UniProtKB/Swiss-Prot annotation:
Subunit structure, interactors included: Monomer.
The name this protein goes by in its record: Peptidyl-tRNA hydrolase
Active site (catalytic residues): H22
Gene from which this protein is expressed: pth
Catalytic activity as recorded in UniProt: an N-acyl-L-alpha-aminoacyl-tRNA + H2O = an N-acyl-L-amino acid + a tRNA + H(+)
Organism (species): Pseudoalteromonas translucida (strain TAC 125)
Amino acid sequence: MNSIQMLVGLANPGPEYANTRHNAGAWFIEQLAARYNCTLKHDPKYHGLTGKVIIQDQEFKLLIPTTYMNLSGKAVGSLANFFKIPVESILVAHDELDLEPGVAKLKKGGGHGGHNGLKDIIAKMANQKDFMRLRIGVGHPGHREMVTGWVLGKAAKADQEKMDAAIDEAVRCMEILAKDGVLKAQNRLHSFKP
């Protein structure tokens, strides 16, 4: 029923970026790892923090690239190639400007929408775009020129609480994804209200 084998959370490395909106994807992987008692370990071979969890008797590889965001494909490609994981069996969690805080959506395929992490993954995966995305809403600052400062900035407390709630729900939905597939997980996640 489920074909996902690898879960990736995009981020920039280092303490100065840890709590910035751009690291929302990594927050998802950290929460998932904590829920399933997995300790993420740095693995230079895969250019990231790696681990594995068993959900509903299925193994999922976890990855948070420790490259900068615009080099995320290096880490994703390394792990996927080593374990022979096809692109459509990868789920990438990332911050999404076009969704409000408190909203998270699962989507298959698509473009990069200007997201440098997605852009690099697509480039390193021979232009294949069919991986799943977990889009975690961080809201939009209103003007294009303000986007960089926005994603590299920290959210207000109320927005952070909404994002945390959406991520928590997304983590719970991985159980549904493993048991009943993407569509059921999508239905549950897309009806969530923080």
